[in-house]
Structures are given as C-alpha cells and as structure tokens.
C-alpha cells in the first residue's frame, strides 16, 4: 500500500508545499544568526530557490491549463487551494468554472454534443449512464490499476460502483460522500419552550414540534420541504417508514409500497395543517433560503450545504444541527447518501494531465485537505476527524452519526428521466390537487414504464 508523502510522493509530484515551507523556515532560522547583509543574501537565495522550484514545476507541466467544471460555488475556495497544491507540484494549471446545478447538465450536454466538454468535471449518479453509454468519459480503469497512489479500496464500494460502467469500466474517482441531518433554530425552540432535537426524537416528535413552532399569522413555519428535494428531503422519511423509490434490482418502482405512501402522506398532512409553507412559496424559495431568513424553524439538509449554512450570519447566531428523527415503529433512522465523482472528457486534448489531476484529487493527501478545510466529507476512509472541527460552532458530528444507517441515493440508467417525472407529479400532492396515494399510483405506473425501456 503506497500512501502520499515521503520519497514516493516527491518522485511523483515534486516538492510539496509543506516541504518548501519547511525548507524556507530552515533558511530563515539560519539567517537570523547572520549579519544584515548575510540575511539579505540568504533571503534572496531562498526566493531564488523557491522561484526555481516553481519554474521547474511549470516547465514539467508544460504551462498547460486544465478546465475544471463544478456546480457548487461554496466549494470553489477550498478546491482552488487544493488544486494550487497540485499546480505547485506538477506545473499543470487549473481553471475552475462554476455553473449552477440548474444549468450544469445543460452545459455539459451541449459540450458533449459539440465536442467541447471541460477537461475534468464532476459526475453524478443521476447522469453517469448517459455519458457512459455514449463513451463521453475517459476510461480510467487501466490508469487506476497502474497507479501507485490511488487506493480505491479506501472509498465506499457503493460510490465506486456508481461510476463503474456495467461493472467493468471505472469512469470516475470518488470525490466525497454526503449524509443528511436536521437543522433547527435554537432561538425559535427557546421561544416556544421546546427542548432541542436529539437522538430520542421520532417523526411524531418532529410533527408535534412543527405544530408548536408554527405561527398562525404565517410569519413562521415549523419546517419546509420541496417536492424536488428528494435526497435531502422526503426520501429519508420514506425509507424510515419501510418504503423505497426503486427496487434493488432497479427494475421496478417503489411508489406502490405502503411505507412510501405513508412517508409522503406524513409530510403532505403536515403541509395541509399549515405547519409548512404552501407550495407556491417553496416553488420560489429553497428550504435553506427560508431557514436563513428566519421563516422556518427546521429543515433537513445535506452535508454539502455546510459552507453556505455555517457561514451565514443569521444561522451562526441562532441555529444548530441534530441527527434526523427516527420512525417510532421501525426504529429506523436512515440517511440517503451519495458521492460525486471526478471524471474527464474522453476527447480532452490533455488526457495525461487530466488523469494526474483526478489521481491527485483522489489521493489521501487531497482528500484529507478537502475534509480539513470543511469543503465536504471526503470519500477516503479515515479523513473525517478534522472535518468535524471545521465549523466548531455547530454539531457536525450529527452528519457522521447519520452514516450508521445509510442507503445509496436511488438511481438507474434513466435516473434523470424518472426523477424529473416524480418531482413534477409530487407537486399535485404538495398543493393538494390530488391525494398523495393517487399521486403515488401515477408515479408507479410511469416509472415502471420508464424502467422497462432502459
């Protein structure tokens, strides 16, 4: 097992930033014992050596620049810092391009059609099949096999398998994992005289709290959830109550299951009672936006949202995190989890450089730094200790505790097709146009037809 660091790392990537810093510190330490003239000379020599090291790396990288596509602006600062380390070591420059989720896949599809995909980009379980079946992604299988730094067994197998097309071609390297937790407004709880959420909470406790936290004038609601928020929203309670979205063999829908109907009905009943904003409000405002504005007391949200929520002044002053409630009957407290992958265009003009970046981003060093900076929960095993400390004002441990009972985000070859259909049809349940049971029957029929055509 080859790990990052030591002589092996230096041979592959050149001097690390840490090594340069240590060398610089040593030079400064010696200089402090010299005369002013000698100190100046030592400083110039130090600068010269640093410049030569940087220049050597740039020459090794050929001055090339990789285009990197992501959709989350909150992760850009941390990823830039990590990629700067990569550039210092290899000379290969990177340019991150941020396209919001709503336009990201349209941008990629246009790039794939026009032959102008970014060199390296994020891949998702929703979309991997589309790009895999049309051979749009660089096959990393042999490169991973020959790598002396990547340790694929350190990543969750379910995440690795998402990006292993038909069980053979590895088309992406895991970037992260995510879990779901409960965010709550401590100030609102205090005003209502309600104890903060903890591991004893059931969904019934949650419902009772939502009722007490709702103000009759519409200025404050107990919670909020959108029909489009599947992984971080309604999916978790569906699985807690014994339901599911898609069967394990990915051949049939789970919307005819008693637990699925029960979980969704639980939520829509609370909406009908007025304990959550009506559909027309959540259609225009994301849950986190309402939470940050002090309009709702509770939301469920993914760990990927930490940079936004934890850096919001209102949230910092008033809110905290707890594990999700559990089902009173089954005792289940499930978190739907997922993980992004680093992929490259099959037609990139810089396949070796793209691979080097992906290899680096999947290394223990980069994965550790990603966690340390609080960007996300890294996928590499054993790198989460410092992630918990990245936002000390909040109970980040709740997200790690949710890893105890996790279910991979539902997906198949046509995920986006049936996911969009589900989102559209759930609107009728959210706004009360149809009963939740009737909507589930409609979804079941259409989803099974879609799965049969995969």
Segments from the language model and where they lie:
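Extracytoplasmic/periplasmic solute-binding protein
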Residues: 166-175, 180, 190, 204-253, ...
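Long, aromatic- and glycine/proline-rich binding clefts that accommodate carbohydrate-like moieties
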Residues: 161, 322, 372-420, 424, ...
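Glycine-centered hinge/linker elements that transmit conformational signals in sensory
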Residues: 209-212, 250-280, 324
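Hinge/lid segment of periplasmic solute-binding proteins
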Residues: 56-60, 126-181, 318-322, 388-392, ...
């Amino acid at each position: 097992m080859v790990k990052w660091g030591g002589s092996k790392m230096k041979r592959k990537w050149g001097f690390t930033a840490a090594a340069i810093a240590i060398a610089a510190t040593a030079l400064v330490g010696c200089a402090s014992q010299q005369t002013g003239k000698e100190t100046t000379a030592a400083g110039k020599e130090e600068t010269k050596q640093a410049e030569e090291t940087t220049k050597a790396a740039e020459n090794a990288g050929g001055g090339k620049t990789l285009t990197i596509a992501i959709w989350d602006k909150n992760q850009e600062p941390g990823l830039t810092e990590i990629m700067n380390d990569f550039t210092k070591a290899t000379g290969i420059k990177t340019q991150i391009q941020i396209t919001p989720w709503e336009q990201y896949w349209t941008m990629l599809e246009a790039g794939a059609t026009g032959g102008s995909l970014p060199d390296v980009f994020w891949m998702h379980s929703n979309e991997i099949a589309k790009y895999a079946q049309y051979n749009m992604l660089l096959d990393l299988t042999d490169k991973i096999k020959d790598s002396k730094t990547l340790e694929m067994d350190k990543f969750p197998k379910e995440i690795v398998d998402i990006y292993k097309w038909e069980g053979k071609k590895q088309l992406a390297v895991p970037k992260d994992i995510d879990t779901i937790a409960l965010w709550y407004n401590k100030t609102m709880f205090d005003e209502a005289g309600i104890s903060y959420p903890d591991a004893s909470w059931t969904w019934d406790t949650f419902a009772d709290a939502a009722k007490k936290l709702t103000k009759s004038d519409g200025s404050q609601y107990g919670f909020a959830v959108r029909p489009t928020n599947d992984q971080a929203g309604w999916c978790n309670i569906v699985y807690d109550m014994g339901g599911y979205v898609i069967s394990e063999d990915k051949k049939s829908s789970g919307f005819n299951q008693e637990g699925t109907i029960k979980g969704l009905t639980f939520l829509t009943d609370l909406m009908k009672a007025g304990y959550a904003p009506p559909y027309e409000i959540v259609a225009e405002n994301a849950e986190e936006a309402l939470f940050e504005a002090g309009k709702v007391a509770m939301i469920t949200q993914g760990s990927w949202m930490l940079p936004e929520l934890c850096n919001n002044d209102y949230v910092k002053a008033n809110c905290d995190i707890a594990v999700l409630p559990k089902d009173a009957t089954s005792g289940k407290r499930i978190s739907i989890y997922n993980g992004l992958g680093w992929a490259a265009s099959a037609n990139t003009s810089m396949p070796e450089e793209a691979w080097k970046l992906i290899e680096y981003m999947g290394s223990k060093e980069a994965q550790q730094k990603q966690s340390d900076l609080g960007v996300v929960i890294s996928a590499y095993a054993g790198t989460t200790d410092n992630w918990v400390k990245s936002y000390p004002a909040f109970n980040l441990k709740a997200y790690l505790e949710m890893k105890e009972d996790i279910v991979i985000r539902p997906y198949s070859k046509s995920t986006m097709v049936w996911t969009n259909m589900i989102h559209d049809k759930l609107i009728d349940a959210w706004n009360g146009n149809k009963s939740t049971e009737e909507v589930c029957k409609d979804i079941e029929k259409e989803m099974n037809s879609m799965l049969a055509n995969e």
